[in-house]
A protein has these predicted regions:
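ATP-dependent carboxylate/acyl-activation modules
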Residues: 1-198
Length: 198
């Protein structure tokens, strides 16, 4: 059943060449990953209702099959604290090419990491860990491994990051939960193994 629902999402996504964020959130939720509270809408009244359920401040992101990098079109707005700003954001995002909705999510504090994957034709599923955010393509601070992974593999990936000191609490920043990060990497590798034939 789980695979059937995920397979349907991935089949739908082939037309764009990537999975839209709400669909990715759905896959992660189905697979037991903890995700931020979120909702998707095209209507102002519903956006306000969702934001109140989630609790301000919220993040708003464009959902569009025509937009791969949301930040390139100013399609991500963080720290929205009130209904008026939320509605203005919806109005602006709705004018961007291919607008299919606005994702509203809870603000999550902390360091941004990227965990990604590619199904290599020779090696099968490859898992990537790196420093996230808009600088991911500039800094190229990443580590790669073939799936499936064990926790020791995840630990080696973390140790290979140049900016790994940020993860352990650099200066006044809080350290991240390394155990949770390793488990997330391992579980993500299992997801990639399960989906490699889809």
């Amino acid at each position: 059943m789980l695979k059937k629902e995920i397979k349907a999402i991935l089949e739908k996504s082939k037309q764009w060449g990537w999975v839209l964020e709400p669909d990715a959130q759905k896959i992660f939720s189905l697979y037991g990953f903890k995700t931020p509270k979120y909702g998707v809408t095209t209507e102002a009244r519903q956006a306000i209702s969702m934001a109140h359920q989630i609790g301000y401040p919220v993040v708003a992101k464009i959902v569009s099959p025509a937009v791969v990098h949301k930040s390139d079109v100013k399609g991500v707005v963080v720290g929205i604290k009130d209904d008026e700003t939320l509605v203005r954001t919806l109005e602006r995002l709705s004018k961007i090419d291919g607008f299919a909705g606005m994702l509203i999510a809870e603000m999550v504090k902390g360091l941004e990491l990227i965990i990604g994957a590619k199904n290599d034709f020779q090696f099968g599923p490859m898992v990537l860990l790196g420093m996230g955010g808009v600088g991911v393509e500039i800094y190229k601070d990443v580590s790669l491994r073939m799936a499936p992974l064990k926790e020791r593999d995840a630990d080696h990936m973390i140790q290979e990051l140049t900016a790994r000191k940020l993860l352990t609490g650099y200066r006044s920043s809080e350290p991240i939960n390394m155990s949770a990060l390793k488990k997330t990497i391992v579980n993500f590798s299992k997801l990639m193994m399960d989906l490699q034939d889809i």
